[in-house]
């Protein structure tokens, strides 16, 4: 089966593309969850756009007219394939016939966009929340980036500004005579509702709205004034002792931002864009005290439950996220510090609202500047983004949705499509997404509801209905209707297994399992999750591999399953499930990105790609192992978070000798340039901007490569080592070969 075709056309990929006919068969044979990854704003030239509203089923499913509906032109009726409800076509469909069908009924139009004829809403709002406790040079770089963004934001979009240090300042941009701001203390535990009431007192209720143009003003009307304010912003004047951290009221800043937007612009698309240069040390949401002798929490302390502020801060930021969801606004965090800023505590706030999370060393580092600029990249004079969105799932009667994993929040809409079991954010068939872009991808998990052995009479269908406001203020409804086949119940058991195996998508399955493992990591011990992954893998290959009982040498996997164990091996070793070399903030960032990207990007995170460049031939993919390292070649590693160029020992010596500057060694210059060009292409396309590293063999930064590759050559290896090929990795970790041998042993045993 061509799994990529469905992704290219509809932005969806399923783990199983043939479905068993009953719940019993599914329990026995679907040893990876039945699910899919769906990208609502997937861009494809095949997507049809129409300027009229959709036609919905009058039954309980509320599904939308699609190519799989049965129509009766003489009677002007159609039958919904989801609930089998008979519906009447409205008068404007009077000309419908077998030869004259509207776009939504054409067989190839499985994804369609409706432009709803509603009044256009104001363009998205951008509220900047700026940390002024950072060093002067970084503050200058940050304000330069913000000034640059004003030229990229549509001129009719509203913008606002909040700065925070020991105090929080809300700027009244509508007052242009001079910079005017309202100051809030950073330390009292003031809640959002009290702040909203305080704002009502600042101005009468009639003036506390978007049209009043006090705190939120269109870019076209305030660009000069806001630019002058940004140019004059100074570092927080509060004196900081040498043994203290700056007083940083991050929580209060978020409270003020949330109160402003929920009061002034409720249910209008918008973003709270927070630029944070250190941990919160005062007021609600603090993650560490101002005393430098007290270190910020580590993974060890989190696991042991010995953190002082984490639980309370997490609940505080989560409540901010829930209120932002209610008012329809996303929260973005740009964490730019060598120290942790509290992403671990803030992660749920960003996830619930569908915001961005960027992790960088400083505000003048390309990881921040390039990532921030990319957010405002336009295509066809518009941002490819959606705001204030809702994703709804409709299923055939024999299929139920168990839940979703991604950056969204539940609408608590328990319809007939909702299954008994919950996976991820479950108990609902619709989810709120405050902001999404072309890469925003959601994992949906399903269960077979049919209790009979015979195949269901209706088609196996899933319909995704996504409503959102685009960056131009128009209301769009995108509908994707996906069909999959049922296994024929007349087949023998082995034929059923073969048919299921042919429909197995190992790449999508690996990503669905990775998301589920990361979701479990929020509440379960990491060793337990690793054992669960191993157990599920053994069950899967035992069911679908060819082998003789108790004979590991006879074990063989068909091509549809052959790479899946490799994915699981690298997932077990990844930063998602191994936290030894990561801080809680870094782990939160890695897991956050896994839960928002599509299949191809997620696979790069799970099993990074390695490209080899040498004089012996053109560049080619290389196995991710220690044996791929050689002294006379260059490697390009892409982990999604890092892009690394690794020069072998001989290549590094030649480069240091300046051979690439000699016209007689043009081939060597071309060899050095090739990975740089490929790396530049990756950096240009990737969001957020990854860490770019160029290193030599045996250098300190080579550790990024050695920590990623399969350690098939270690200090304990008994085989003789050719010094020109391979690299010894000093680790006790199990390598891929040993992992696969143990897998075969457990899979074939009686």
Swiss-Prot record:
Keyword hit for Metal-binding: yes
Record keywords, A-Z: Cytoplasmic vesicle, Endoplasmic reticulum, ER-Golgi transport, Golgi apparatus, Membrane, Metal-binding, Protein transport, Transport, Zinc
Biological process, per Gene Ontology: COPII-coated vesicle cargo loading; intracellular protein transport
CDD domains the UniProt entry points to: Sec23_C
Compartment(s) of residence: Cytoplasmic vesicle, COPII-coated vesicle membrane; Endoplasmic reticulum membrane; Golgi apparatus membrane
GO molecular function annotations of the record: GTPase activator activity; zinc ion binding
Presence of keyword Protein transport: yes
One GO CC annotation: endoplasmic reticulum membrane
Membrane topology summary: Peripheral membrane protein
Role: Component of the coat protein complex II (COPII) which promotes the formation of transport vesicles from the endoplasmic reticulum (ER). The coat has two main functions, the physical deformation of the endoplasmic reticulum membrane into vesicles and the selection of cargo molecules.
Record PANTHER family: PROTEIN TRANSPORT PROTEIN SEC23
Quaternary state and interactors: The COPII coat is composed of at least 5 proteins: the sec23/24 complex, the sec13/31 complex, and the protein sar1A or sar1B.
Name of the featured protein: Protein transport protein SEC23
Species of provenance: Dictyostelium discoideum (Social amoeba)
Gene name in the database record: sec23
